[in-house]
Amino acid sequence: MPYYKPIKRIKDKEESTRIAERLLTLRRQLDEQIPRKTATDTLLLATWNIREFGDNRRTESLHFIAEIVSRFDLIAVQEISRKLDGLEKLMSLLGPNWDYIVTDSTEGTAGGGERMAFVYDKNKVTFRNMASEIVLAAKAELVPKDLQFARTPFCVAFQAGWFKFNIATVHIFYGKASDTQIEERRLNEIKKAVEFLSKRAKDEDLSYILLGDFNIPNCKTDYMKALESKKFFIPDAIKEHPSNLGKSKHYDQIAFNIKLEATMELFDKKNQKAGAFDFTESVYKAEDLEIYRKFFPPTAFTVKDTKTKEMRDKTEKEIEKYYMNDYRTFEMSDHLPLWVELKIDFSNQYLEKLKDQ
């Protein structure tokens, strides 16, 4: 569990009390909706685009994020800012049993100066001393004049229990949804990532996982078809969960290309556990507007009138929209963490194999 002692040092009694109360509520929700971590039997894997995750969050938000992250064994995080202050504060709350591996920040306007990271619990997950960025061959351009990904996919080797795997996280280019060339680039980024990793999986005879923010609007698009190709697949238990805050888009996904013996199954076919965790059931709820109103910047209360072009005070409905779509998404995120539970103890299968030799 994360460190809670820093809450005692908060001088504002109202704030410290609220954090403690909301953490209790959040913990109850997590207990109900996320399986408990095990010592050796399972791996709780997640991906979370934490919106512009830098040094821009209130202390209470970091406590809430740490509480959620702590319930997983390995989590891929996208949209980390160039400055690592936010990530380092998160790690200090998670404690010494946690570690992270992070990319360099991207250059150019398309990448937004972002980083990606894997955050993992060292009690369960071991780094196998390999980390790399995926660089395409010179002839493999995505669209004319675009020779590489906007944000380079990041691949790392890990082991959890019996399960050795390489895992790559992505934040696929989005742009404007109505722009045909941008849609083509988004599709080709997914295709090229899948092609690259599927070839590696075949050549190395090793399991690969591809996860992150693919900016896939729904499961019936060419984007999803591209992701589920070249022997990559997504369990239905994952696909059925939209992952944006409005629960209308399937932006985030977790795909697998597995190289295990037939008896060694990662998934529970009868009762596969997966989901998208909606933290707004416990924190930054719709009815919490009045709690956080005093923390809004002055610009949150005024807007330029479309007719007069003069600044005017926002209506209460406009302020509510700001809280729901902007303020709380920059404190937590506009994405929900998408997760899946994997089976990683193959002791019985291995012993059965030895017995039959």
Ranges and model annotations:
Residues M1-Q357:
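Divalent cation-coordinating acidic motifs and surrounding scaffolds
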